[in-house]
Protein backbone atom coordinates (compact mmCIF):
# COMPACT_ATOMS: atom_id res chain seq x y z
CA UNK A 1 0.00 0.00 0.00
CA UNK A 2 2.80 2.40 0.89
CA UNK A 3 4.53 1.59 -2.39
CA UNK A 4 1.31 2.15 -4.32
CA UNK A 5 0.82 5.54 -2.67
CA UNK A 6 4.40 6.50 -3.47
CA UNK A 7 4.05 5.36 -7.10
CA UNK A 8 0.81 7.34 -7.46
CA UNK A 9 2.55 10.41 -6.07
CA UNK A 10 5.38 9.99 -8.58
CA UNK A 11 2.87 9.57 -11.43
CA UNK A 12 0.98 12.67 -10.31
CA UNK A 13 4.26 14.59 -10.29
CA UNK A 14 5.09 13.43 -13.82
CA UNK A 15 1.58 14.34 -15.04
CA UNK A 16 1.88 17.83 -13.56
CA UNK A 17 5.34 18.31 -15.10
CA UNK A 18 4.08 17.25 -18.55
CA UNK A 19 1.02 19.48 -18.20
CA UNK A 20 3.19 22.45 -17.20
CA UNK A 21 5.58 21.82 -20.11
CA UNK A 22 2.70 21.71 -22.60
CA UNK A 23 1.19 24.86 -21.10
CA UNK A 24 4.57 26.61 -21.23
CA UNK A 25 5.00 25.67 -24.90
CA UNK A 26 1.48 26.86 -25.69
CA UNK A 27 2.18 30.15 -23.91
CA UNK A 28 5.36 30.66 -25.95
CA UNK A 29 3.45 30.08 -29.18
CA UNK A 30 0.65 32.42 -28.08
CA UNK A 31 3.19 35.03 -26.96
CA UNK A 32 4.86 35.09 -30.39
CA UNK A 33 1.47 35.30 -32.11
CA UNK A 34 0.28 38.14 -29.88
CA UNK A 35 3.52 40.11 -30.15
CA UNK A 36 3.36 39.83 -33.93
CA UNK A 37 -0.28 40.94 -33.98
CA UNK A 38 0.12 43.83 -31.54
CA UNK A 39 3.21 45.18 -33.28
CA UNK A 40 1.77 44.74 -36.77
CA UNK A 41 -1.54 46.51 -36.10
CA UNK A 42 -0.24 50.01 -35.25
CA UNK A 43 2.70 49.64 -37.63
CA UNK A 44 0.36 48.88 -40.55
CA UNK A 45 -1.75 51.91 -39.64
CA UNK A 46 1.34 54.13 -39.48
CA UNK A 47 2.49 52.99 -42.93
CA UNK A 48 -1.01 53.55 -44.33
CA UNK A 49 -1.33 57.09 -42.98
CA UNK A 50 2.18 58.02 -44.10
CA UNK A 51 1.19 56.98 -47.62
CA UNK A 52 -2.02 59.00 -47.38
CA UNK A 53 -0.10 62.09 -46.29
CA UNK A 54 1.93 61.93 -49.49
CA UNK A 55 -1.16 63.04 -51.41
CA UNK A 56 -0.61 66.72 -52.28
CA UNK A 57 -4.32 67.26 -52.89
CA UNK A 58 -5.27 66.78 -49.22
CA UNK A 59 -6.95 69.73 -47.55
CA UNK A 60 -5.49 71.04 -44.28
CA UNK A 61 -8.25 69.64 -42.03
CA UNK A 62 -7.82 66.13 -43.43
CA UNK A 63 -4.06 66.40 -43.19
CA UNK A 64 -4.31 67.39 -39.51
CA UNK A 65 -6.68 64.50 -38.81
CA UNK A 66 -4.27 62.05 -40.43
CA UNK A 67 -1.35 63.46 -38.44
CA UNK A 68 -3.33 63.14 -35.19
CA UNK A 69 -4.16 59.51 -35.97
CA UNK A 70 -0.54 58.89 -36.91
CA UNK A 71 0.58 60.33 -33.57
CA UNK A 72 -1.83 58.08 -31.64
CA UNK A 73 -0.69 54.96 -33.47
CA UNK A 74 2.96 55.91 -32.95
CA UNK A 75 2.40 56.42 -29.22
CA UNK A 76 0.65 53.05 -28.99
CA UNK A 77 3.57 51.34 -30.72
CA UNK A 78 6.01 53.15 -28.42
CA UNK A 79 4.08 52.02 -25.31
CA UNK A 80 3.99 48.44 -26.53
CA UNK A 81 7.74 48.37 -27.19
CA UNK A 82 8.41 49.93 -23.77
CA UNK A 83 6.16 47.33 -22.10
CA UNK A 84 7.92 44.50 -23.94
CA UNK A 85 11.28 45.91 -22.85
CA UNK A 86 10.19 46.23 -19.21
CA UNK A 87 8.71 42.72 -19.23
CA UNK A 88 11.89 41.28 -20.73
CA UNK A 89 14.08 42.97 -18.10
CA UNK A 90 11.81 41.86 -15.27
CA UNK A 91 11.70 38.25 -16.52
CA UNK A 92 15.49 38.09 -16.78
CA UNK A 93 16.07 39.84 -13.45
CA UNK A 94 18.10 42.47 -15.29
CA UNK A 95 16.34 45.40 -13.68
CA UNK A 96 17.47 47.96 -11.11
CA UNK A 97 15.43 48.95 -8.08
CA UNK A 98 16.16 52.00 -5.93
CA UNK A 99 14.31 51.47 -2.62
CA UNK A 100 13.33 54.52 -0.61
CA UNK A 101 10.90 55.21 2.20
CA UNK A 102 7.49 55.85 0.65
CA UNK A 103 4.14 56.65 2.22
CA UNK A 104 1.91 54.38 0.18
CA UNK A 105 -1.31 56.30 0.82
CA UNK A 106 0.20 59.53 -0.52
CA UNK A 107 1.51 57.73 -3.60
CA UNK A 108 -1.94 56.25 -4.27
CA UNK A 109 -3.52 59.70 -4.04
CA UNK A 110 -0.96 61.11 -6.47
CA UNK A 111 -1.55 58.34 -9.02
CA UNK A 112 -5.34 58.71 -8.77
CA UNK A 113 -5.01 62.48 -9.22
CA UNK A 114 -2.77 62.00 -12.26
CA UNK A 115 -5.28 59.57 -13.80
CA UNK A 116 -8.40 61.56 -12.85
CA UNK A 117 -9.38 62.37 -16.45
CA UNK A 118 -9.14 58.71 -17.38
CA UNK A 119 -11.03 57.38 -14.34
CA UNK A 120 -13.80 59.95 -14.85
CA UNK A 121 -14.13 59.11 -18.55
CA UNK A 122 -14.41 55.39 -17.74
CA UNK A 123 -17.74 55.90 -15.96
CA UNK A 124 -16.46 53.87 -13.00
CA UNK A 125 -16.86 55.36 -9.52
CA UNK A 126 -13.46 54.93 -7.84
CA UNK A 127 -13.58 54.72 -4.02
CA UNK A 128 -10.21 54.75 -2.24
CA UNK A 129 -10.12 53.80 1.45
CA UNK A 130 -7.03 54.59 3.52
CA UNK A 131 -6.12 53.60 7.09
CA UNK A 132 -5.97 56.36 9.72
CA UNK A 133 -2.23 55.80 10.16
CA UNK A 134 0.49 56.41 7.57
CA UNK A 135 1.71 53.32 5.70
CA UNK A 136 5.48 53.49 5.13
CA UNK A 137 7.30 51.00 2.91
CA UNK A 138 10.78 50.62 1.41
CA UNK A 139 9.97 50.63 -2.30
CA UNK A 140 11.20 51.92 -5.63
CA UNK A 141 9.02 54.97 -6.24
CA UNK A 142 9.01 54.79 -10.04
CA UNK A 143 8.30 51.05 -10.20
CA UNK A 144 5.59 51.27 -7.52
CA UNK A 145 3.97 54.16 -9.39
CA UNK A 146 3.92 51.93 -12.48
CA UNK A 147 2.29 49.11 -10.50
CA UNK A 148 -0.51 51.38 -9.26
CA UNK A 149 -0.93 53.03 -12.65
CA UNK A 150 -1.22 49.69 -14.46
CA UNK A 151 -3.77 48.35 -11.98
CA UNK A 152 -5.96 51.47 -12.10
CA UNK A 153 -5.75 51.78 -15.90
CA UNK A 154 -6.74 48.12 -16.16
CA UNK A 155 -9.89 48.88 -14.14
CA UNK A 156 -10.77 51.83 -16.41
CA UNK A 157 -10.54 49.51 -19.42
CA UNK A 158 -12.40 46.46 -18.20
CA UNK A 159 -14.70 47.48 -15.32
CA UNK A 160 -18.39 47.87 -16.04
CA UNK A 161 -19.35 51.55 -16.42
CA UNK A 162 -21.71 52.78 -13.72
CA UNK A 163 -20.26 50.45 -11.07
CA UNK A 164 -17.85 51.15 -8.24
CA UNK A 165 -14.20 50.18 -7.96
CA UNK A 166 -12.73 49.94 -4.48
CA UNK A 167 -9.08 50.55 -3.61
CA UNK A 168 -8.49 49.47 -0.02
CA UNK A 169 -5.15 50.09 1.70
CA UNK A 170 -4.54 48.34 5.04
CA UNK A 171 -1.73 47.08 7.24
CA UNK A 172 -1.66 43.44 8.30
CA UNK A 173 1.07 41.93 10.46
CA UNK A 174 3.45 44.76 9.65
CA UNK A 175 2.90 44.51 5.89
CA UNK A 176 1.05 46.87 3.57
CA UNK A 177 -1.89 45.24 1.80
CA UNK A 178 -3.57 46.90 -1.19
CA UNK A 179 -6.81 45.33 -2.40
CA UNK A 180 -8.61 46.43 -5.56
CA UNK A 181 -12.12 45.24 -6.41
CA UNK A 182 -14.27 45.95 -9.44
CA UNK A 183 -17.09 44.48 -11.51
CA UNK A 184 -15.80 43.28 -14.87
CA UNK A 185 -17.60 44.30 -18.05
CA UNK A 186 -16.21 41.20 -19.76
CA UNK A 187 -17.00 37.55 -19.15
CA UNK A 188 -13.70 35.87 -18.31
CA UNK A 189 -13.36 32.64 -20.28
CA UNK A 190 -10.09 31.68 -18.59
CA UNK A 191 -8.94 30.85 -15.07
CA UNK A 192 -8.60 33.96 -12.92
CA UNK A 193 -5.16 32.77 -11.80
CA UNK A 194 -3.91 33.39 -15.36
CA UNK A 195 -5.07 37.01 -15.48
CA UNK A 196 -1.53 38.25 -14.76
CA UNK A 197 0.05 36.09 -17.46
CA UNK A 198 1.71 37.93 -20.32
CA UNK A 199 -0.64 38.95 -23.15
CA UNK A 200 -3.75 37.72 -21.36
CA UNK A 201 -6.49 40.30 -21.91
CA UNK A 202 -10.00 40.69 -20.55
CA UNK A 203 -11.35 41.23 -24.06
CA UNK A 204 -10.60 38.28 -26.29
CA UNK A 205 -11.46 40.31 -29.41
CA UNK A 206 -8.68 42.77 -28.41
CA UNK A 207 -10.93 45.79 -28.95
CA UNK A 208 -9.38 47.90 -26.19
CA UNK A 209 -6.10 49.74 -26.52
CA UNK A 210 -3.39 47.88 -24.65
CA UNK A 211 -0.54 45.42 -24.82
CA UNK A 212 -1.85 42.72 -22.49
CA UNK A 213 1.30 43.23 -20.40
CA UNK A 214 0.04 45.70 -17.78
CA UNK A 215 -0.88 43.22 -15.05
CA UNK A 216 2.12 40.99 -15.83
CA UNK A 217 4.44 43.98 -15.33
CA UNK A 218 2.61 44.96 -12.13
CA UNK A 219 2.97 41.41 -10.80
CA UNK A 220 6.68 41.20 -11.69
CA UNK A 221 7.50 44.59 -10.13
CA UNK A 222 5.56 43.62 -6.99
CA UNK A 223 7.27 40.24 -6.59
CA UNK A 224 10.73 41.67 -7.29
CA UNK A 225 10.17 44.08 -4.39
CA UNK A 226 9.21 41.29 -2.01
CA UNK A 227 5.45 41.59 -2.45
Residue ranges of model-derived segments:
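Short beta-strand/loop element within the Bergerat-fold HATPase_c
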Residues: 162-174
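Short helix-loop "hinge" at the ATP-lid/N-box region of the Bergerat-fold HATPase_c
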Residues: 155-156
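Short conserved segment of the HATPase_c
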Residues: 187-201
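Conserved catalytic submotifs in the C-terminal HATPase_c
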Residues: 98-102, 120, 125-135
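Short alpha-helical segment of the dimerization/phosphotransfer core of two-component systems
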Residues: 72-77
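A conserved beta-strand-to-alpha-helix junction within the catalytic ATP-binding
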Residues: 98-112
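Conserved micro-motifs of the catalytic ATP-binding
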Residues: 92-97, 136-139
Amino acid sequence: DALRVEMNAVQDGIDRAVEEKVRSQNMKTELITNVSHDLKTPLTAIITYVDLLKDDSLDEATRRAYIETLDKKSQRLKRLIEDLFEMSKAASGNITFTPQTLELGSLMRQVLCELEDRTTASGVDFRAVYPPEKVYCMLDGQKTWRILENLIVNITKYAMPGTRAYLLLTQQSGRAVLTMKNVSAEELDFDAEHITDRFVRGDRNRSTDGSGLGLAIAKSFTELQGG
